[in-house]
Design a protein with these regions (language model features):
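N-terminal beta-alpha lobe that positions the nucleotide/phosphoryl donor
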Residues: 1-176, 180
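Short "domain-exit" segments at the C-terminal end of structured domains
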Residues: 181-185
C-alpha cells in the first residue's frame, strides 16, 4: 500500500493511488494513480476516484448480501448451463437492488461533487478495476462492465451497482468457483 490514504478508506482519489495499491483498488485504478503522480513529467490523465476492495466487501456485507450470494453459489450445479444463467441473473439482480451502506454512499457522493467541479453537464466513466483482474494466476480482464458518458450522481451510483453485479456474470461465476476467488467468501 502506498500509505497515501487510510487502509479502511472506502473511496480514494486517483491522485493518492500508486502501483502498490493494486490489491486495494485494482490494476486499472492503481495504474491511473501512478500516471497522475507523473504529471510533472508531462503525462496527462483524467482525474477520478476509486472505490476500494474494502468498500466492495462492506457493500456485500450490508444486509447479509454475502450470505445470500454464497447460498446461491453453494447450491449451484456448474455443469447445468441453464441453472448457471438463472443463478447468475438472480445474483446480479440482488446486487443491483442492494442499497449502499450510508457511509459508502456518502463517501461516493462527496468524491463525485469534488470530481464534478461545478460542471453539471460533465460525463464520467464507471468501470471495474477488480483486484483479481490483473493477477498473474487469474484472468478476469474484460469480464466486468464499463459504462461511458454517465451523467449525474444518481446514474453514477446506479452504474456502480451494475459494475459490482457484473462480477457475477456467468463466466465470472465459473472463474470464481473454479479458482476459489477470495471475494466469494
Amino acid at each position: 500500500m502506498s500509505n497515501l490514504f487510510d487502509a479502511t478508506a472506502l473511496v480514494v482519489p486517483f491522485e493518492k493511488l500508486r502501483m502498490t495499491d493494486v490489491e486495494i483498488v485494482g490494476g486499472k485504478n492503481a495504474s491511473l494513480g501512478e500516471m497522475i503522480s507523473q504529471l510533472p513529467s508531462g503525462v496527462k490523465v483524467p482525474t477520478g476516484f476509486a472505490t476500494t476492495a474494502h468498500a466492495f466487501r462492506e457493500f456485500l456485507k450490508f444486509d447479509g448480501l454475502t450470505e445470500r450470494i454464497n447460498a446461491k453459489l453453494d447450491a449451484l450445479d456448474t455443469e447445468d448451463v441453464r441453472a448457471l444463467a438463472a443463478v447468475g441473473a438472480e445474483i446480479r439482480a440482488m446486487v443491483e437492488a442492494q442499497p449502499f451502506p450510508a457511509d459508502l454512499e456518502t463517501a461516493i457522493r462527496e468524491a463525485f461533487v469534488t470530481l464534478q467541479g461545478g460542471q453539471p453537464d460533465a460525463s464520467f466513466a464507471v468501470r471495474s478495476s477488480a483486484t483479481a483482474e490483473d493477477l498473474p494466476d487469474a484472468s478476469f480482464a474484460g469480464q466486468q462492465e464499463t459504462f461511458l458518458n454517465v451523467h449525474g450522481i444518481d446514474e453514477v451510483l446506479h452504474k456502480m451497482k451494475e459494475v459490482f453485479a457484473s462480477l457475477y456474470n456467468d463466466r465470472a461465476i465459473l472463474s470464481l468457483i473454479h479458482i476459489s476467488e477470495p471475494t466469494r467468501h
